[in-house]
Amino acid sequence: MPVTAIVGGQWGDEGKGKVVDMLAQEADYVVRFSGGDNAGHTVINPMGEFKLHIIPSGVFYPGVKCIIGNGVVINPDVFIRERNELISRGVDVKNVFISDRAHLVLPYHILLDGLEEEARGNKSLGTTRRGIGPAFVDKYARMGIRVGDLLLPEYLHERLEYVLECKNQILTKVYDAAPISLDEIYETCLKWGKELAPNIKETTHIIEEAISQDKKIIMEGAQGALLDPDFGTYPYGTSSSPLAAGGCLGIGIGPASVSATLGVFKAYSTRVGGGPMPTELLDKTGDIIRDEAHEYGTTTGRPRRIGWFDAVAGRFSCQINGMTTAIMTRLDIMDILPAISICTAYELNGKIIKYFPANSGELAKCKPVYEEMPGWLCSTKEVRCYDDLPLAAKNYICRIEELIGCQMSAVCIGPSREQTIYK
């Protein structure tokens, strides 16, 4: 089957956007399957640098159809703004479609996200405050408004009336905030419906036909496996599954249709927001890596937390995704380091463990067990053949492959398409 899932192997920000952009030139479809505009993908190509939050990274190829699947929650304002910016920069967006089953991020979701984070105080989860979590809560509480509802004014009004009655009770009585106007939000939704009507499709049928015609489909993941609500650092995670299995649910296909799962790993670890991170570097080395790599969130602008590569977490990520191959990004950032460490195990309560604990409290107590490897202290940015990489760099890649149990099919040594080395 011609479906390839591309997923993040860490806490997000691994470089999936570049990988999708790179592989999309041979694809017929690129489909986003999870998350919302809380995830940011940076793509650098001959047209310039683009920061995408909701539109799939395959949009830069005119022949590729890009679908935002039912598993994504969509803020129409963000989609419209992103679409219009792409158009203004000469990108053809006529092949961008949205599933009518996808749920909406509405103004009250954003408002509640901020109020809930404020109420948590120093126990806040570090959300992006873009309303993603509350939108998924409504989806599973059967209070959500879906994209297709925008095209059915009477049904939309009925749904909004019911939902706002509940939301305004929470806003006024729990948070002492002003209520949301039904008329205002209804008018906003009607405007969105007119604006999005050409993009809204019954996408499961489109994808089913594509599979039957043996078309090449990329399932584009958002965020990373270690943020999964079941297998990640709960509750410090995201609200939808970024795993390959989540891709099947998020676009409407069966697992047998997926022929390959490609995991994307940085050569080191990063994380945004709260939650345990065993290999976090709070010293000068972390600052050096952050500055060299410009590690600041695409969506939030917050400085990312930096750590050494965590092979325990990486192996777990390979397992729960069923990765068939992987790609390492940002190897070039390690060029400046005289020595590099890899976490091969954890020490928990005086015992050495090689598994990823389910409990975030336990994970926070884990001390990394490191294996130190020599750096190479020379630039890899201009290398175009794997054999021409410094021996120490190849040894580093090989050791990570051994530890996570998955082979790297390519290594990225810079942001552009040309800075990708295939093994």
From Swiss-Prot:
It is found in: Cytoplasm. Mg(2+) binds at residues 13, 40. PANTHER family: ADENYLOSUCCINATE SYNTHETASE. Keywords: Cytoplasm, GTP-binding, Ligase, Magnesium, Metal-binding, Nucleotide-binding, Purine biosynthesis. Homodimer. GO terms for molecular function: adenylosuccinate synthase activity; GTP binding; magnesium ion binding. GTP binds at residues 12-18, 40-42, 304, 330-332, 412-414. Plays an important role in the de novo pathway of purine nucleotide biosynthesis. Catalyzes the first committed step in the biosynthesis of AMP from IMP. InterPro entries: Adenylosuccin_syn_GTP-bd, Adenylosuccinate_synth_dom1, Adenylosuccinate_synth_dom2, Adenylosuccinate_synth_dom3, Adenylosuccinate_synthetase, P-loop_NTPase. Its cofactor is Mg(2+). It comes from the Bacteria. This is Adenylosuccinate synthetase. GO terms for cellular component: cytoplasm.
